[in-house]
Amino acid sequence: MAVPSLWPWGACLPVIFLSLGFGLDTVEVCPSLDIRSEVAELRQLENCSVVEGHLQILLMFTATGEDFRGLSFPRLTQVTDYLLLFRVYGLESLRDLFPNLAVIRGTRLFLGYALVIFEMPHLRDVALPALGAVLRGAVRVEKNQELCHLSTIDWGLLQPAPGANHIVGNKLGEECADVCPGVLGAAGEPCAKTTFSGHTDYRCWTSSHCQRVCPCPHGMACTARGECCHTECLGGCSQPEDPRACVACRHLYFQGACLWACPPGTYQYESWRCVTAERCASLHSVPGRASTFGIHQGSCLAQCPSGFTRNSSSIFCHKCEGLCPKECKVGTKTIDSIQAAQDLVGCTHVEGSLILNLRQGYNLEPQLQHSLGLVETITGFLKIKHSFALVSLGFFKNLKLIRGDAMVDGNYTLYVLDNQNLQQLGSWVAAGLTIPVGKIYFAFNPRLCLEHIYRLEEVTGTRGRQNKAEINPRTNGDRAACQTRTLRFVSNVTEADRILLRWERYEPLEARDLLSFIVYYKESPFQNATEHVGPDACGTQSWNLLDVELPLSRTQEPGVTLASLKPWTQYAVFVRAITLTTEEDSPHQGAQSPIVYLRTLPAAPTVPQDVISTSNSSSHLLVRWKPPTQRNGNLTYYLVLWQRLAEDGDLYLNDYCHRGLRLPTSNNDPRFDGEDGDPEAEMESDCCPCQHPPPGQVLPPLEAQEASFQKKFENFLHNAITIPISPWKVTSINKSPQRDSGRHRRAAGPLRLGGNSSDFEIQEDKVPRERAVLSGLRHFTEYRIDIHACNHAAHTVGCSAATFVFARTMPHREADGIPGKVAWEASSKNSVLLRWLEPPDPNGLILKYEIKYRRLGEEATVLCVSRLRYAKFGGVHLALLPPGNYSARVRATSLAGNGSWTDSVAFYILGPEEEDAGGLHVLLTATPVGLTLLIVLAALGFFYGKKRNRTLYASVNPEYFSASDMYVPDEWEVPREQISIIRELGQGSFGMVYEGLARGLEAGEESTPVALKTVNELASPRECIEFLKEASVMKAFKCHHVVRLLGVVSQGQPTLVIMELMTRGDLKSHLRSLRPEAENNPGLPQPALGEMIQMAGEIADGMAYLAANKFVHRDLAARNCMVSQDFTVKIGDFGMTRDVYETDYYRKGGKGLLPVRWMAPESLKDGIFTTHSDVWSFGVVLWEIVTLAEQPYQGLSNEQVLKFVMDGGVLEELEGCPLQLQELMSRCWQPNPRLRPSFTHILDSIQEELRPSFRLLSFYYSPECRGARGSLPTTDAEPDSSPTPRDCSPQNGGPGH
C-alpha cells in the first residue's frame, strides 16, 4: 500500500506562491471591503494582496455559476480581520476565487468568528488550499445545504484552539462523496493522515486538493516541497529559511521581510506591519479630517490612550501633567445618545459647538459625566434642547468657559430650550462659568426655576445682554396652563414607513413670537393617548419629537414628514407651536392640535421563523414554522413552494464495494414531538423593561452568543433586502415569471437551484396556518421548501423573502427491487454474462449491486458490482468458474439501503469433455440426417440401459465406499423418538439448524434443550457421511470452553447431530447486536475491558485444550465461537454451525474457500496450519471483540488482504483500544511463528483478571493441562500431519488442497 507523504499538498495543489517582495510598492493593501449584490463588485479585489480589515461577500441572489467562472484573485494572501460569506448564489467553491489566501489573522472578529460561511445555497466545498493559519477566532459554517468535504478538514492544523468552531446544518456526511486524493481509487498521491476530534483520517479540501501538513516543528510553515520556512513565515514560503520569501508574516512585516519586532524608527500598525513616523502621521481615521494618529509605546495608534496627548508639533503621545489636556475638534456635534457622548471621553478642550438632544434614557448623569466631565472649554456655543432625559447639567462639572466663537442664530452662546424635566444647572455657578460674548437664552423649561437662571446671568457676566423675552418668566419655572389656540391638520398622506403632515398656518398677535413647531408622535395601538410629554413611569420618554422650522413664506402651510415608521402601525400625532410673549403683562399665547390617529400602509412581512420538517411516509413531508417577527399587515396566508432536488451524480464516481456506504437519513425532527406553541401569543407586560437581569438569572454564554449571531444575520436581511420579489407569481421554473424589476430589485431571490434541479417543476400551495403537508412527492427524494409570509396587501407589496428548509421523504419499500428476471449468456470459456434491468424508480440513486451465486453442492459466493461497472455491460461477467451447475440472484443497493433479492436464475459451465462432445456434434451435423439420428438413438439407448442397472456415486477411490468411509453407530447414538424439534435457528454449512428437546439424554433431567444439526434433503450419501464424520471429531473433546457433542441420530432420515444449545448464537452476531445503532440490540451495554478479557480468556482456554490434544482449528474467528445463555464463549463445532458469512471467505485460484482475513502469513504463502497460525487468528478475534465485530482490513478486497498480509502487513492499531489488549494482539501477529505466544502463555498473562469461576471450570487450571505443558505442538506441521479427519473441508486444506 502506498505510504502517504507528509506534505502531499505540494504535488496536487494549484497554489502559486507569489514572490511579491512584500514592499509597499508591490503589495497592495486594501481597506475593509463589503461586496454585495453584483458579482462585478468583486473586481475591487483585483490588485489586493492584503485586506487590512474584513472581507464580506454577501447577498448575490441573481448570480450563477457562469458568473464566477474564470474569476480569480491569486494576489490575495491575507485578511487581517475576518472573512464572511452569506447568501452568494451560484458560487460552488472558493478554490478558484482565492487560490492563495493563506492567513486570516482575526484581529477584529465577527461575533467571535474569523471565518463565517452562512447560507451559501450552492457552495459544494470550502477549498481554500493555501490556507495555513487562522490566528484568532473560531470558524462558523452553517446552513449550507450542498457543502461537503467538511469531515476531511483538520481545523486543528489552522487554529490554535478549534474547540469553539460551530459547523452544523450542512449537507449530511452520509450524502457526501468525501474522498481524498489517492484513496479508494481517487487520483493523486495519498494525503497526510492526522487525528482531529478523536478521528484519524486523510486530510483534504476536495477530492483533488490535499490539506497542507508540514513536517516542520513548532507549527512552522513549509514550501511546496516540504522544506521548512523561516520561523517568521506564516502560511508558506517560496524559499526555505528566507524571511523575505514568506507568503505572510507570523509577527510583523517591513519592506519585504518578516520580523519579530519593528526596526528602529518604525512602529507597529494594525498588529501586522511596521510603518514610519511619517507614514503614521499621514493616516486618517476619518477621511477629510485631520489625523489624530499618535505613536505610543512603539505602536501607531488612531488616538493617544487615556492620560496621554499629542500636540501639533509632535506625533508622539506625551503623559499629561495633572488633568490631561485633550483637544477635540468636533465642528458642531449633536449628542443624542450615550454612545455619541462617548466620542468625547477625555476631552478637555472642545473646538466647536455642542448640541445636547437627549430625549430618552434613565439616570444618564453618571454616564454623561464619564464622557463630558473633563470638558473645561467649548469654543463655540452650547445648545441644550428637547432633552427630556436630563434633570441636571451637573455632568459638566469642570466647564469654565463657553467662548462663543460661533453662536446660535448669531446671538446666543448658551441656548436652553424645551427641557421638560431640567431642574438644576449643576456646579456652573460655583465653578465660575464665563461667557465672554453673546447672550444666553432659556425658554420652555417649566421645571427650571428663574432664580437659577438669574444667578447664572450674574456669574457669567451676561446680565443686561438679553431682554425679558429671552429669559421669559412665563415659560421657565411656570407650570401654569397657557392660553392656547387649536391647530387643525389640513392634510395627511400615509405610506408604509412615513407620514406626510400639513397643518394650518398659525399667526400669534406678534408674528415674531412664533419660534417653531414641535410634532409629537408615538405608536398607539389603542386610541387612548394623552398629551403628557414628560418621561413615563419607567423613566423613558413616551413621545417622539420632531422640530419643524417655520416656512420661509408666510402664506405656506407648515408641514413635516415622519420617517422610519413601522408599516401597518397606528400612530398618535399632535403638533404644538413654540411661542414667546414679549409683553410681560400680556397673556401667554400658544397653539396645539388635538391628538389624531393615523395608520401607516402595509408592507411585505419579514421572513417566517424556525422552519422545521419531517417525513411520515414515502410521499409526504410535514413542514412547520413560526410567524414572522414583523407582520406589517394582517397576515392572511403563507405561500409554500417546493422543488425536487437532483441527487448528487458524483456519488456514482465512488466504488461503494470498497468504500463504506453511509446512508442519508430522513429522520424526524425531534422538535415535532413537542407541543405547538401559540404563534399568536404576544408578550404583554405592565412593567418597565429591566435594566439588569434578575438575580440568579444568567443567560448561558453559548446561548447568548447564538442569539447574538442570529440577530446579526437578521439585521443583514432587514438592512439589505428592502422588499422581496413577489414569489407568488411563480408557477414553474420553465415559465417566464413576471416580476417587478423596479422596487423589488434588491429582494431575496426566488427559489432557484443549481445542478439539474431546474429540470424539476416548482410547485406551490397557499396555507392559512403555520404548517403544511406536501403530498404526491417522490419516495426518498430531497426537496427544497421555501415559505413566504403574505399579508392582506400581498397583491401590491408582495410576500416576504423566503425562509427555506431541505427535507427528504421516506424510502419506498419495494422501489429498489429489480424488475423482471435475471438473464445469462455464455461469454467465454468458464465465464458467463449475467444481465438484469435496473430498478426503474429507485430510492435516490442505485450505488451498487450484489450477486449471490453458488455452484450446486457448494457454499454461496457474494460478488459486489459498482454502478459504473454495471453500466458498462448492463450486468456483470462471472469468470474463472469451475464446470458445473450454478444458480444466482441479484439485489440492488440504493441511497436508502438494500433492495430485495431476485428469483434465482440457473446456468451452467461446461467441462472439457462436454466441450469436446459439443465439437463432435457440430462435425456430425454435416453428415446425412439419417446417420446422425441413428448415432443419437444408439447413444441414448446405451446410457439408458446403464442408468437402469446402477447409480454411480463419485469417489476418489476405485471402490464406491471403503470401510473407513462408512459411519458405524456407537454409544453416542440416540433413538429418534427421544428428539422433538421446536423451531428453526438458522442455516448451517450442511443444512438447517434447529432448537429442540432431547428426552433422557442426561441423568436426572427429563428433557434437555439442544441444538439439532441436519443435512439438506438433497444431500448425497457422501455428504451425509462427511456430516457425521465432522461430528465424530468432537466425540473426543470434553472441555467447558468447547461446544459439546451430546449425541448422534444416524438411523433413518434426516441425519441429526445433537449439540449443546448456545442460545445467544455466534460471537460475531452477538457483538454486532451490542452496537448502539443495531436494530436487534438487546439493551445491553457495550462490553467493558474486564468483559473483553474474560471473552479472550475463555476462547484461549478452549484453544489451549485443542492444542493439547494435537488439534489445529484452522478457522478460528468470532463467527465460529458460540455464546451461551450466561455469556460464556466457547469454541464452535468446526464449521457445522457457522452461519453463512460468505464475505468472510475467499476462493483462491479455484480452490476451497479460505478465511484470508484471519489467516497467518505462513498459511497464505505455504498452506501451513499449526497452533502458531491459530494464535495469529486469535489476535484477529481480539480485534473483532474490541471493534464489536467490524470486518478486518476494512476497505481492502480479499486479493489486497492476501498480498498485504504476505508482505508483512498487520491490522492498524485501534483508537482508544486498551493497551493490554493492543499489546496482546501485537504479540499474536509476530511474523516469525515461533515468537508468538502459546495459548497457555496468553492465559498466564491475563489469569489475574479472569473471574473466580474460571478457575473451577477451565482446562487451564486442570491437572490435564499441567501434565500437557511442554508437549504442545510447536513445529510447523504439514497439513496432512494434522490429526483432524476433515480432509475434504476447504478450511483445512494445506498444500495441494
From Swiss-Prot:
The active site is at D1115. It is a single-pass type I membrane protein. Changing G1065E: In a glioblastoma multiforme sample; somatic mutation. ATP binds at L985, G986, Q987, G988, S989, F990, G991, M992, V993, K1013. GO terms for biological process: actin cytoskeleton organization; cell surface receptor protein tyrosine kinase signaling pathway; cellular response to alkaline pH; insulin receptor signaling pathway; male sex determination; protein autophosphorylation. Residues 1281-1297 have a biased composition (Polar residues). Its EC number is 2.7.10.1. Residues 1-26 form the signal peptide. Residues 483-603, 607-707, 818-913 form the Fibronectin type-III domain. Disulfide bonds join C214-C222, C216-C228, C229-C237, C233-C246, C249-C258, C262-C274, C280-C300, C304-C317, C320-C324, C657-C864. Pfam families: fn3, Furin-like, PK_Tyr_Ser-Thr, Recep_L_domain. It catalyses: L-tyrosyl-[protein] + ATP = O-phospho-L-tyrosyl-[protein] + ADP + H(+). Residues 675-685 have a biased composition (Acidic residues). Belongs to the protein kinase superfamily. Tyr protein kinase family. Insulin receptor subfamily. Receptor with tyrosine-protein kinase activity. Functions as a pH sensing receptor which is activated by increased extracellular pH. Activates an intracellular signaling pathway that involves IRS1 and AKT1/PKB. This is Insulin receptor-related protein. It comes from Homo sapiens (Human).
